[in-house]
Structures are given as structure tokens and as C-alpha cells.
Amino acid sequence: KDDIERMVKEAESYKEEDDKQRDRIAAKNSLEGYAFQMKATLDEEAIKSKVSEEDRKKILDKVDEVLKWLDANALAEKDEFEHQRKELESVCNPIITKLYQQAGGAGAGGMPGGFPGGFPGTDGSGGGAAGGDGGKSGPTIEEVD
């Protein structure tokens, strides 16, 4: 019985540390995923023709900088990963938002297929798109059983 109580206390004492580690890893994965998502978005043919070479280079340079930082700082704290993501979003979001608005919103106006996988930055992991509600001015489509 004493062993069980001791193990429960040990588990409780490690819980906070485990939670911090989980949050740190989630922030790292979020940053890495966003960086690769931006890179993939810019490689799509439908997007390539709509982004200026200057804007494309600006995003890709920042993505490469972030990926190099990730390689060198794999054990960084959650706040550092979140800061890097915000910096990356501050470069990407204005360009992608402008592109999205030029396309006429959610897949309309010459943007075949829209943004595959959804609009970058709206994966629910924070940040979101700079520029307000994005393409929410159009009709709402609800799934019916």
C-alpha cells in the first residue's frame, strides 16, 4: 500500500513537468508544420503564378531561416517556438491574405480548388490569418445527414 501511495505522489509530481514538455513539443510541431505548409503552398502551380517573385522569396527566406533555427534549437522552450511562429506569420500572413483576397475568397474567382488543406494559418493552433475574417463573407454551407 505504501508503494502505491508513493507511486501516485511521484506521478503527480511529474505531471506538471510532463504537461510542460507536451506543450513545448506541440509548439515546436506547430511551428514546423506551419513552415512546411507555407513552403508547400508556394510550390503549388495555382499559387506560383499569383505570388510575385519578391513576395515568394520573402516567405521562402523566412521559412528557411525558421527551419534552420529549429534544427539548431530543437530543445528550445515553448515561448521561443511561439515567438518564431509569430515572426513567420508576420511575414507570411499579409502576403497570403492579399493573395487570398485577390482570389475572391474561398476558392472562387480563378483559384481552382482554393487552398488545399484550408487557408494557411487557420489550423486552430493559434495565430490565425491577419486581415480579419478571411473569406467568411460568402454563403455558409452546412453538412446535412
Curated annotation (Swiss-Prot):
Outline the segment boundaries, as ranges, of region: Disordered.
Answer: 1-21, 103-145
Pfam families listed in its UniProt record: HSP70 (PF00012)
| Protein's recorded name | Allergen MAG29
Q: Which GO terms describe its molecular function?
A: ATP binding; ATP-dependent protein folding chaperone
Q: Which family does it belong to?
A: Belongs to the heat shock protein 70 family.
Which InterPro entries would you find in this protein's record? HSP70_C_sf, Hsp_70_fam
> What PANTHER family would the database entry show?
CHAPERONE PROTEIN DNAK, HSC70CB, ISOFORM G-RELATED
Q: Does the keyword GTP-binding apply?
A: no
Superkingdom of the source species: Eukaryota
**Cellular component GO terms, alphabetically?**
endoplasmic reticulum chaperone complex
Keyword check for Transcription, yes or no. Answer: no
Compositional bias ranges of the Gly residues kind: 104-137
* Annotated keywords: Allergen, ATP-binding, Nucleotide-binding
Q: Which GO terms describe its biological process?
A: endoplasmic reticulum unfolded protein response
SUPFAM superfamilies named in the record:
Heat shock protein 70kD (HSP70), C-terminal subdomain (SSF100934)
